[in-house]
């Protein structure tokens, strides 16, 4: 029986070699090995260690990954075993993430009060400017109304002329005289308003630039301190699908995929951009936290801060000082964000 089985295998090998001259058992083994190595390299360079941990510990996540990647059972098992060997690397990166969270906490506790003071000073000054713009505008409107009313004297004088035996002509003459003066006053008031508004806009622009610099510095430091933490902001299910599609492409093309994905070392700028929607970071992170089965309060704090900073920068971009009301509204929204950041700072300080 054993001899018959060996004979069948021998016949199959001859048939395969005749129909596929370049194929050998050793060649297929090397090809699978090369594919596994490429996938391992891909995971090391582009996949978050936390995401890898979820894939290795969640049967549902792994089955979905295998299904989307269209991996045969044998290749999937081999890849799983190879990825398990990366767990020390995952542990190291988890420790690194905890260190960066602690680094962020220490830095934020120390530096934020000074940043808050500078931004608050800008907010208060912007409100003063808004009040001054409104006051000047109101005064100029009153001046224009007064100058316009003097023209009524001339109109009344012409209308009353047939009935007043010329008496109304004196009214008209007075109106003309006042009209000349009021026209000059109207022009002057417009010049005053335009000049002051331009000056106020320049001052507001400088204040905006100052607080923007503070916020951008805060954002850049956050990006530098918390790249691993920011990878949490990506939707886990969608990211799994992206990884599986790239692995599928690797398997079919036998070539390394070049397009960037969820790089945990090189966090793309648009990761921070996606945090603008209020509530989204917390929702996504808690979803990942459920998969991990552990609390991620430190991550939530960092993402809340990043979200508020980015939102505040967006407010800066929209502030053009076109009116006192728009300045007040912008200052109010910025202050609300600053208050939330202050609350986070107080919570961290309380431990």
UniProtKB/Swiss-Prot annotation:
GO BP terms, alphabetized: lipid metabolic process; lipid transport; lipoprotein metabolic process
Molecular functions (GO terms): lipid binding
Places the protein is found: Secreted
Residue ranges the record marks as coiled coil: none
Recorded GO CC terms: extracellular space; intracellular membrane-bounded organelle
Alphabetized UniProt keyword annotations: Lipid transport, Secreted, Signal, Transport
Top-rank taxon, per record: Eukaryota
ATP-binding is among the record's keywords: no
Cystine residue pairs: none
KW DNA-binding (keyword) present: no
Endpoints of the signal sequence: 1-21
A Pfam family this chain is assigned to: ApoL
Summary of the tissues where the protein is detected: Widely expressed; the highest levels are in spinal cord, placenta, adrenal gland; also detected in spleen, bone marrow, uterus, trachea, mammary gland and testis; levels are low in brain, heart and pancreas.
Function of the protein: May play a role in lipid exchange and transport throughout the body. May participate in reverse cholesterol transport from peripheral cells to the liver.
Family from the record: Belongs to the apolipoprotein L family.
Protein name per Swiss-Prot or TrEMBL: Apolipoprotein L4
Species per Swiss-Prot/TrEMBL record: Homo sapiens
